[in-house]
Amino acid sequence: MSKVIIIGGGAAGLLAGIAAATYGAEVTIIEKMRVPGKKMLITGKGRCNITNAGELQDIIKNIPGNGRFLNSALRQFSNDDIVCLLECNGLETKVERGNRVFPVSDK
């Protein structure tokens, strides 16, 4: 079994941990803050706004400045992909006003 250490328990670090564990790795996540993923918990007025379910071009258009620089990255791993990943790992989601995606649990 492979052993993987991930530095940082933010959204990217936690998702990297899920991905590595899915492939059978033993994962350790090292986070300097007391609670991993804490910034995610404060998005959407404390309800964990995960993503936006709108069309990718609309999302890019609404990014301040030049959102087009994110075009290739978002096409590689889209808003639909993150929702699918989370739901495949047991997190039910819901879409609310403005196409905002939240966990059904609101946390």
Give the positions of each predicted feature.
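Conserved N-terminal/central alpha/beta ligand/cofactor-binding core
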Residues: K32, K38-K107
